[in-house]
Amino acid sequence: MKKKQQQHPGGGTDPWPHGAPVGGAPPCLGSCKRRIPLLPFLRFSLRDYGFCMATLLVFCLGSLFYQLSGGPPRFLLDLRQYLGNSTYLDDHGPPPSKVLPFPSQVVYNRVGKCGSRTVVLLLRILSEKHGFNLVTSDIHNKTRLTKNEQMELIKNISTAEQPYLFTRHVHFLNFSRFGGDQPVYINIIRDPVSRFLSNYFFRRFGDWRGEQNHMIRTPSMRQEERYLDINECILENYPECSNPRLFYIIPYFCGQHPRCREPGEWALERAKLNVNENFLLVGILEELEDVLLLLERFLPHYFKGVLSIYKDPEHRKLGNMTVTVRKTVPSPEAVQILYQRMRYEYEFYHYVREQFHLLKRKLGLKSRVSGPPVRPQFFIPTPLETEEPIDDEEQDDEKWLEDIYKR
């Protein structure tokens, strides 16, 4: 019986019913009508390329819109590229030398009792030395502003002669919200309990600048209030030693929104976000020399030579005059209560401290502190009040700085 020949898919019989001969493709019989379809692949590649380019364009436009709508200042973006996103353990050494752009608008919205008078003294010397415009304010006890006050202050700052460095005790201002160019922010904070104790005794007894300094600063304070024992103030829950007065550092970074003055997660997270997006550097007072070193590294047009000035014996002598006098340490029970009431302040402080140390490691600087920070144990926190805070009574009279500088 004859076997049926296999039918070829294109019609007719298949000349190789058992497969094509070994050793290559079969010769073309008759006219070859089958071709390899290259064009569809080419068309697919062009479509894919066009899709990628369109996506890139949308991303670029979105980035531009973000920048115009209040994104981080260009200098901070360049700095992040300079430092990279890897951790120190992923690096093999300090980053290669590179020239960073020069920001011409810097704001130091200094936190009270965090070394600001020392830094202002240094800035006065540096502004004369390097020729930048140091802009200060005669208002020292108004940190929260109305919308109109924000607009007026931003207008005054933005029209200052550049390059400028503006400094004042004021909560974070969003320049972009009012159509201004967002400046680069810098600041310094310290351990919250240490800051509170320094301010508590400074308001009552001043510092080494003069015996009557505190009388000028708080003339209306009654004697019983001036000599109020710190433990009684804390344990008896006096307004000065409880919330919202203790919720002090975070609003400087959270901003002017009313919720920024309410102790809680919302203000804390917003403060962290602003630190990441708008602050070039937030240092800690406990490591002031490293803070000055980083400022000199990032802002040489403002801070070049600041460390040598700070270490100068004459400056040390003047700096010692700003040390608060008559400070006493509260009892352990009182300190633990302060920890409980300042839980959000401590969470923010430790976050800033860790970011500061990470930045130092990326630049190859060894931390001067040994071991990890000891975090306070809050146990069961007491309820945090959210009433309107009392205005900051710290009036930073800077006339003495001018008198010292003229010597």
Swiss-Prot record:
Region (Disordered) residue spans: 1-20, 386-407
Lumenal compartment segments: 71-407
Keywords associated with the record: Glycoprotein, Golgi apparatus, Membrane, Signal-anchor, Transferase, Transmembrane, Transmembrane helix
Active site: residue positions: 169
Enzyme nomenclature, EC number: 2.8.2.-
Topology relative to the membrane: Single-pass type II membrane protein
Transmembrane segments: 50-70
Composition-biased stretches (Acidic residues): 386-400
Residue positions the entry lists as glycosylated: 85, 141, 156, 174, 320
Xref: InterPro entries: Heparan_SO4_2-O-STrfase, P-loop_NTPase, Sulfotransferase
Transmembrane among keywords: yes
Superkingdom to which the source organism belongs: Eukaryota
GO molecular function terms attached to this record: 3'-phosphoadenosine 5'-phosphosulfate binding; chondroitin 2-sulfotransferase activity; dermatan 2-sulfotransferase activity
GO cellular component: Golgi membrane
GO BP annotations listed: dermatan sulfate proteoglycan biosynthetic process; establishment of cell polarity; regulation of axonogenesis
Topological domains annotated Cytoplasmic: 1-49
Family: Belongs to the sulfotransferase 3 family.
Protein name (record): Uronyl 2-sulfotransferase
Species this chain originates from: Mus musculus
